[in-house]
Amino acid sequence: MNSLCRSKQAPFEYTLSLIGGKWKMRILYELGCEKTMRYGELKRAMPFITHKMLSAQLKELQTDGLIHRSEVSHTPLKVEYSLSDRGRSLYPLIDEMCKWGMAQGGPHM
């Protein structure tokens, strides 16, 4: 491993610890597109994620400071999720991933 790679390994591992896994980037992508979403809207946007996994991923993203969770009413409880400033700072990375996928022949919508 060359010294440039070695010097970037820790920041790379840290970033992966925040956004790694099957669903976190997709959640960040959806929130970046829609600005604010309720739990049910996120679930409909990602029909193959289980409720347990979506709840766990949202909690992790909130704990890591990448999303905000806001209670908009108490009876019945209504919660909205949005990107934090820290989460929005990842959006250029997400956009570049989309561009890369299109350039590699991925599906266009």
From Swiss-Prot:
Pfam families: HxlR (PF01638)
InterPro entries per the UniProt record, alphabetical: HTH_HxlR (IPR002577), WH-like_DNA-bd_sf (IPR036388), WH_DNA-bd_sf (IPR036390)
UniProt KW keywords: DNA-binding, Transcription, Transcription regulation
Alphabetized Gene3D superfamilies for the sequence: Winged helix-like DNA-binding domain superfamily/Winged helix DNA-binding domain
Name of the protein described by the UniProt record: Uncharacterized HTH-type transcriptional regulator YdzF
GO MF entries: DNA binding
Ranges of residues in domain HTH hxlR-type: 10-109
Species this protein is from: Bacillus subtilis (strain 168)
